[in-house]
């Protein structure tokens, strides 16, 4: 589980999967941009906007003794940035690699669970991060996916 927690750190595994998919098929570059934007949004919203405002202490900082298996993060606990980036990446990468959905979502789920297992997040941190990641993926997709021209015609023209 520590390995999964490390794999999710910094979004590196998701960027690597994206690069491999683009290397295999150059037509996936727009989709890769969506993945990278979703990861960037997930980081910005969790670590720069929400964590400093909520300022929730990590489980190992409380009165109950919590065993920490991984290194102790210096940031606040809620929401989980690992869960946010993993869900954002799994959702956006699923569009690039539909056959890999099971692998992507399994990895995202295991990364989230690993954060609880290694003692650095509460379950609600992971759930909140996952919901945030979902929202970031939807926003990134909306911003970077071209829309067909509107067929609406103004009747007064």
Language-model-derived ranges and their functions:
Residues 31-33, 38-72, 76-79:
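Helix-adjacent hinge/juxtasegments
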């Amino acid at each position: 589980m520590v390995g999964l927690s490390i794999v999710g750190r910094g979004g590196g595994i998701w960027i690597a999967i994206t690069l491999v998919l683009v290397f295999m098929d150059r037509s996936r570059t727009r989709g890769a941009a969506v993945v990278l934007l979703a990861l960037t949004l997930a980081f910005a919203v969790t670590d720069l906007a929400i964590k400093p405002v909520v300022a929730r202490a990590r489980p190992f900082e409380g009165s109950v003794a919590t065993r920490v298996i991984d290194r102790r993060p210096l940031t606040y606990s809620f929401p989980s940035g690992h869960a946010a980036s993993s869900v954002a990446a799994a959702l956006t990468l699923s569009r690039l690699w539909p056959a890999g959905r099971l692998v992507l979502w399994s990895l995202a789920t295991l990364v989230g669970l690993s954060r609880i297992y290694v003692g650095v997040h509460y379950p609600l941190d992971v759930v909140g991060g996952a919901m945030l990641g979902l929202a970031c993926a939807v926003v990134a997709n909306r911003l970077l996916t071209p829309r067909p021209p509107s067929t609406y015609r103004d009747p007064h023209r």
